[in-house]
Amino acid sequence: SSAASMCIRDSIMYNILDGAPPTDKIVYGTTNYVNGDTPIPKMLSQTLQQQGTFFKEVNASVVGHYAGVNTLLTGNYMFTQGLRNKPLTPTIFEYLRRLTGEKATKTWFIGNGIGNSIPLLDYSTHSDYGAQYGANFLAPIVTFGNSGDKHLKNAKVYHPEEELDPMYKMKYFLDNVWYSQGSALPNIGNTEEEKLEIKQFVRDMFQKKDSGSIAFPPISDSGDLQTIGYACEVLKRFKPTLTVIYLSNVDGCHGNFSSYLRSLHRADHGVGHLWDFIQNQVPEMSGNTTMIVAPEHGRNDDPNGPFGSSFLP
């Protein structure tokens, strides 16, 4: 896209930004005759740029991958912190829960997968905050994917008064083993009622998946779009005060340029669907929800390579 004075001439992200689809034959959509030859229809009658505030510039420092998401969630640049470490400064989840007393099921971090240390960002190691103020983390394409089908789908939801006693005995045994090794077992503070509610949600999602009734966008052919669909289900069920959704497919800064465009186009479609779902399917959140859309961090200027995974579609 090219921009001048807030006016975008062409855009493949026409739910978020103003501008019509490019007239050039760019292969970024779904497939009819040639890979990506059919743009995904627009979801919103009015772009998010028109409905909200468009920030043209951002002051960025360490913005790559984990460090970038860490910075977004904590408001602090992580110059020396690498992967496989939880944030050193409190996350927005912790600030919300500690300062307002919000319960755990009102705070969610939904990620597209469990790689790149993303699950570590649900709370920090700060001594004044930490796990007890963290967010519930969900990686839906893992939880409800092949691994979930194998290990969780047919798991029993135990009656809290009649059947949980032997389960608690096992839990306490395992907890004590953890404590005996000198570590505290992290706990974000879901009450027993909240835990049961989450278990029932997981069970319901497997049923909805089998019946084809998950709130997916009209096009859901990527991990990002499927993640958006499950995020809609979380919003519908729990009406969270704060939800962060991480879409990783757009993180293709050194890969196939055509695939990069497709991921951007699909992210736009998913964000449009998410906003439409909030306004029309979750009355408790319609009209009183703020959505902040942060872009991916750009890519190099290399074209598609002639060989291997970078070959033009």
Kindly give the residue locations of the regions a language model identified.
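Metal-dependent active-site segment of extracytoplasmic phospho-/sulfohydrolases and closely related
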Residues: 1, 267-308
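Short, small-residue-biased leader/transition segments that mark boundaries at the very start
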Residues: 3-8
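Short, structured active-site-proximal loop/turn typified by the sulfatase FGly-forming signature C/S-X-P-X-R
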Residues: 10-64, 108
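Loop/turn elements at helix/coil->beta-strand transitions in domains of secreted/extracellular proteins
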Residues: 49-55, 101-107, 237-243, 285-290
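Substrate-binding rim/cap in mid-to-C-terminal beta-strand-loop elements of soluble/periplasmic
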Residues: 67-75, 308-313
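Acidic, His- and aromatic-enriched active-site or binding-groove loops in soluble protein domains
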Residues: 78-93, 125-165
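Extended, charge-rich helix/loop segments that form flexible
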Residues: 150-223
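Active-site His/acidic residue clusters
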Residues: 204-215, 226-273, 277
